[in-house]
Amino acid sequence: MKKLLILASTLMLMVLSCGNSGSESKSSGNAGTGSKKYRIGITQIVSHPALDSAREGFKAAFKEAGVNAEFDEKNANGETTNSNLIANNFVSSKEDLIFAIATNAAQSASQATNDIPVVFAAITDPQSAGILKNNVTGVSDRMDVKQQLELLKKIAPNTKNVGVIYNSSEQNSKIQVEDLKKAAKELGLNIVEKSVVQANEIPQAVDNLVREADAIYLPTDNLVASVVSLITEKATAAKKIVFGAEAAHVKGGALITQGVSYYEIGKEAGKMAIEILKNGKKPSEIKFKTMPLSEIEVNEKTLAALGISLPEDVKSKAKMIQ
C-alpha cells in the first residue's frame, strides 16, 4: 500500500510539472563556473500573468546577481491539495529554499517545514494568513489603495460610486475590499460590492456593476485575474472606467493603474532569497516588506474607446500601453 501511495504522489507531481504554463519544471540561473548551485523549489498556486511575472522576477534576481541556481517549478493548478503535495515533496527532496507564490502556496510551504527557508510573494496580509514563522519572510502585494482612488478622481472627478468585484472566499481580496472601503470613505466615495466564488458568476456581477457604478476597481484577486478581458470589455462597452491594482489588468483592457509590479515583487523576493542562501542571513532577520506603487500605466486603446482625455499632470507621468 505504501509503495502505491508513493507512486501516486510521484505521478501527481509529474502532472503538476507538465501543467506549468508551458515552462519546463526545472531551469537554471546563469552564474560563473564552479560556484555552488542552489536548489530552489518554486510553488505557484495558479498560473495567470501577475503570478507568472512574480516567478520570472524572482529568477531574474538570481541571473542578475550571478548566483547559480536550479529552479524546480511546480503549479498547483488552483488546488490546495496539490499545493500541500508540492510543498511536502520539496521538503522531502531537501531543497535549499522554497519560493511560494500566493497565499495558499505559502501556507502549504509554511506548514510543511520549520527548517527550510521559505520566501513568499503576492500575499496581501501574511500576518492574517498565518504564515509568519522564523523560517519565513517575503514580499507582500498590499498597496496604498487611497492613492489609486485619488488617481481615479483626477481623471473622472464626477465619480461617486465605485464598483468592486472580488472572490469572497479569497482572504487577500476581502482585506483589499476593506482597505478600499476605508479609503473611499475618506474621499467621499461610495463602494458598490459584488462578490463571487466562481468564474461563471462574474458576467452577471459585472452587468450589475455597470448599471450601479460609475467606475470599477479590480483588486489583485486570482479569480478576477482569470477573466480580466471579459470584465473590461463589458465595462468599456458601457463607457465605464476600469482601474486595476496592477499592470496585468491594464494589459487586459483596464484603463489605468498605479498599482504594484509583480515582476518587481518577485525580484525583491529573489534578492531576499540570495541574502539567505549566499550571505547566510536567517529569514527571521529579514522583515517582510511591501513595495512602493509603480508608475502610472494607461491602455491607449481603452482610452480611445472611452473617449476621455487625461489631465496633463497624469498624462505626463503615464506609460502608454498598446
List the predicted regions and their residue ranges.
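Short hydrophobic alpha-helices and adjacent helix-cap/hinge residues
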Residues: 18-322
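Sec-dependent signal peptide recognition
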Residues: 2-8
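Repetitive helical segments and hydrophobic/amphipathic motifs
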Residues: 11-12
